[in-house]
Amino acid sequence: MRLVLLGPPGSGKGTQAAQMQETLQIPHISTGDLLRSEVVAGTPLGLQAKQVMAQGDLVSDAILLGMLESRLSHTDVVKGFILDGYPRNLSQAAALDGLLAKFGHPLNAVVQLEVPTDVLVERIAGRAQAEGREDDTPDAVRKRLQVYNDSTAPVIGFYQQRGILLRVDGVGRLDEVSQRIAVALGC
């Protein structure tokens, strides 16, 4: 099963992806983790990304797609994968479609974790306070959420039009949300 897990910061994507990885026995591919590991490994794409990040710029879609293509060529993804952190915009969604078409394996589903803004702000601000991060104020969190919503809304529409978007309530205990995802996926 080839899945994308979408949701705003604080929605529990990483937590749910880890749970889904265990349940479905397919790898969780976090583009953030992938980017960091490529940089640490000193791969050609990692070196390009490191140079871009050192200048304070965002890593290009082309570099991310190259890293993802490399990762999807590994044998552990034959049975599927859970992709987290990508796509973040419409051009990335189209690029992912093209990449998966190249492999002959389109997405089966896109799970959208839906969590109200006030709950997200509470989760992130609480996590930031516990970690001693002063930059995640409620106002800063709301701004990040707005940026996410602005860039991701078209992606959600893109997958909804294709009939593969599954909206799941992301509020509740870990096991409750995991159960909702399993039901939505028919597992």
From Swiss-Prot:
Signal peptide: none annotated. ATP binds at residues 10-15, 127, 172. It is found in: Cytoplasm. It is an enzyme of class 2 (transferase). Disulfide bonds: none annotated. One of its GO terms (biological process) is AMP salvage. It catalyses: AMP + ATP = 2 ADP. Pathway: Purine metabolism; AMP biosynthesis via salvage pathway; AMP from ADP: step 1/1. GO terms for molecular function: adenylate kinase activity; ATP binding. AMP binds at residues 31, 36, 57-59, 85-88, 92, 133, 144. PROSITE patterns: ADENYLATE_KINASE. Pfam families: ADK (PF00406). The keyword ATP-binding applies. Its main location: cytoplasm. Keywords: ATP-binding, Cytoplasm, Kinase, Nucleotide biosynthesis, Nucleotide-binding, Transferase. Consists of three domains, a large central CORE domain and two small peripheral domains, NMPbind and LID, which undergo movements during catalysis. The LID domain closes over the site of phosphoryl transfer upon ATP binding. Assembling and dissambling the active center during each catalytic cycle provides an effective means to prevent ATP hydrolysis. Catalyzes the reversible transfer of the terminal phosphate group between ATP and AMP. Plays an important role in cellular energy homeostasis and in adenine nucleotide metabolism. NCBIfam families: PRK00279.1-3 (NF001381), PRK14527.1 (NF011100), PRK14531.1 (NF011104), PRK14532.1 (NF011105). Monomer. This is Adenylate kinase. It comes from Xylella fastidiosa (strain Temecula1 / ATCC 700964).
